[in-house]
Amino acid sequence: MDSGDFSPMQSNFSLGFMSFEDIPEDARTTEMIDKIVFEEDKEYDHTQDSFRYGRVTTGVSYNLVTGKIPKTVFEQVKAKDDENDNVEFEMEHLEDKETAHKTQTFDELYESQMPKYFDYQSNFSDVNGIWTLLFDQNHYEKMSTFELQAAICAALNSKHFMMICVGIDAFNAVTGVEMSAKDRVVFRMALTRAVAGEFQPPLVKVAPKQLTGVSPMKRDISEVTSSIDVLFVPVIGVTDEVENNRFLIVVRVKEISDKVYQISSGRIYNEQEGRVVEMSDMNEAFHKLIVEKSISDIQTRRGSMFMLEPEPFLEDSAVIFTESNEIPSENHEISRVHVKNCTERSLSQSLLNLLDIQNIGWIFFGTALSFCIYNNAIKPLVK
């Protein structure tokens, strides 16, 4: 998918508030169900798992519904993965206290404003402090991992918390997306793939088989990084005879990073006026993301970024300013004479200040010494 296709329905920095309500019994078990990757081959054929392979270092984009990639690309990335299976698993940033504090800040913003479930066609209010991208349910079938990568890259480079919400129409009504348990598993694996293999510097350092092997926990992005995850928030009240299987998809970026990120294709993204914008090159990225972001106080833009020069001021001025801006014409000549005299006095006073008593003594001593040398040495020779 081309970068020009990335056009979320809505994008905003939120301002609103939504209160919690009691969680229905079905909703309480949703998270546990989503963690399950089917172990029986009849329900889920692991041999057809496109996410088992494909450490996406060649710009591959998965479809979020089918989880498929082109066969030719599949063989290439599979061969590359077999070479990289000995990569050690690293999650140092999970132990970083500063990262944990930032994640906690996001969790506080999210939990205080987002409900545990939504009523069908209810209004989606803004969320304060979190950049929010909204997509409708029709866009879900066309979405690819590229759109997730571009938005995540923009959020990280712009130092924003972010939510990508899929299942909200043009009127901000929550419709959700119809998803089976298998669909949710495929989406989780797609997000894990998008985050684990596409970013430079890497967001997750992990070998492909460790990431997408038999263990179901390794298929959830929240198990390998604390900065990004996905939630499936239940949407209830749909008048269908079938069981309730509508969810609002919420992809969350919970960490603010000081690094500059790009995806494997070399593209760099940034947030501008609530939109995901591709930057032209790395030079532009460093200029906008480092120089401009480091100058947080707008006042510093008025002068040197290294030193702020003081404002002009008057000290011991000979001219007395009055509240009136008009000076009578008969006083003009007097003012000029007064200013001239004050200027001459100031110059002479400045010279005297430079010459203290000690300096005057040395001047007299030098003059006397020069006179003696002239009389005793130079004058007899001239005669």
From Swiss-Prot:
It is found in: Mitochondrion membrane. It comes from the Eukaryota. Keywords: Membrane, Mitochondrion, Transmembrane, Transmembrane helix. GO terms for cellular component: endoplasmic reticulum; endoribonuclease complex; mitochondrial membrane; mitochondrion. The chain crosses the membrane at residues 354-374. Disruption phenotype: Triggers mild activation of the piRNA sensor, this activation is lost in later generations. In a slfl-4 mutant background, almost complete loss of mature piRNAs and piRNA precursor accumulation. It is a single-pass membrane protein. Residues 118-266 are annotated as: SLFN-like fold. GO terms for biological process: primary piRNA processing. Its main location: mitochondrion. The keyword Mitochondrion applies. Component of the PUCH (precursor of 21U RNA 5'-end cleavage holoenzyme) complex; consisting of tofu-1, tofu-2 and either slfl-3 or slfl-4. Within the complex, interacts (via N-terminus) with tofu-2 (via N-terminus); the presence of tofu-1 is required for the interaction. Component of the trimeric PUCH (precursor of 21U RNA 5'-end cleavage holoenzyme) complex, that acts as an endoribonuclease processing the 5'-end of precursor Piwi-interacting RNAs (piRNAs). The PUCH complex consists of tofu-1, tofu-2 and either slfl-3 or slfl-4, where tofu-2 exhibits endoribonuclease activity. PUCH-mediated processing strictly requires a 7-methyl-G cap (m7 G-cap) and an uracil at position three (U3). PUCH also exhibits a strict bias for piRNA precursors with an A or G at position 1. Belongs to the Schlafen family. The transmembrane domain is mediating the localization to mitochondria. The proximity to mitochondria plays an important role in piRNA production. This is Schlafen-like protein 3. It comes from Caenorhabditis elegans.
